[in-house]
Every structure is written in structure tokens, then in C-alpha cells.
Amino acid sequence: MFTDKDQNFVKVELDTTLFLGRKHIGEEFFDLLLRYEGIYLPERWDTEDRARLRRSFDRSCLPEFIEEWTRADEWKTLFFTRKRPSPIELSVDIQRHEGAKFNEFSAYIHESHFKSTAQEKELLNFTIDMSLITGADYGLIAHRRQERRQSPVLTPAERLPGIYWA
């Protein structure tokens, strides 16, 4: 997984007040990853952040995936990863408790993927499609190196000004 020391990636963060742990949202999320193929199609997934995620990601894992997606845990994170052609990591935080305010989708794409404007457009289209599925209330796309040179992108959840869309 990417560490705080790595700066060579673009991050996408989508936050929503919509509860994501519903079956139809999990199915739409799964279908979106399959539809985009290429770099956005994970090779592996898991419910814990491990050096090597244990479960393969393909059409046959849908029942197991939906079972984990809808499991009534107070707070869970699902992790997805792909190593080639460029590293990418995705995660979904699903909170189901009284004080829950936001559920979150995050993506970290290594900068080596962005060789032309075609990859940038693909990222924007993927982000738009994911925001429609998650019902994103706000989100951001930022290059980690630039964010560190300036200041962190802050969000409305932190009640501070930042670069975001609503």
C-alpha cells in the first residue's frame, strides 16, 4: 500500500452522507470497476489492509463481495489493489452507527499512469461515475506532491476552507 512518504500519486476522495452498505450500491460499485477495466479494475481485495490482499477480484467473487459489503459491522473498510501496469489502490469506508456522518471512497493512482490527456479524462469520467454511485456530497482530486508543497486539501467535514466541489 502507499505510505505517507510516497508522493508520486494522485488521490481521489469522495465523501457522502449516503449509507453505502446497501446491496444495490455494492452491485453498482462492483459493476463500475468491471466496466472501467484497465487500471481501475483491481486484481485483489480484502477487508483488512495487508501487504498482499487475499481475495482475487473478478466476476466470480460477486456473492462474497456483496456479503462483505452489506455485513452489519459498525465500521468497515474494503481495500482493493492493482500492481500493474501502474499501481492503484482503492478503499471504501462504510460506517453504520449512530454517530456516523460520512462514508468515503478513496483512490490512489500512481502518477506514471498519466501519460496523456486520455488518462486524465478517464480519471475524471471514473470519478464522475463513482460520485453518482456513492451520492458524493463533496470530493477532491489532488496530486500528493503538490498538496504537500502547499497545504492539505481540507474539506467541509473539517469545517475549514479547501478545494472541493459540492
Where are these regions (language model features)?
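N-terminal low-complexity, intrinsically disordered segments
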Residues: 19-91
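Structural alpha-beta junctions
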Residues: 35-42, 125-140
